[in-house]
Amino acid sequence: MRVIVFVKATEDSEKGTMPSSELLEAMGRYNEELIKAGIMLGGDGLQPSIYAKRVAFSGSDRSVIDGPFAETKELVSGYWIWDVRDMDEAVEWVKRCPNPMPGPSDIEIRPLYEASDFA
């Protein structure tokens, strides 16, 4: 099953505070483990929402909203896409992840739809 793994943004990540060199090295080693295990399909870190844009749809109208998105309760600062046996395997891999932020943080795992889900 394929899953997307979201690293939730924090106040620091939204300020553009870069991870320490130690954390970058630890995350690099972790990503190498994911690749060697054959589960990592992709992933990246995201820049703060101040650099983002949203396109709002209302019928045939479109409007562009510039970041930052202070009113949004939860933002994403990074993601992976993994191919795992099941959700339990994904949870076990997340538990092995270095804390992606200097302080408290959350990582969310969500299954992706497959073509067979729409058959």
PLM segments and residue spans:
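Conserved, structured core segments of small domains
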Residues: 1-119
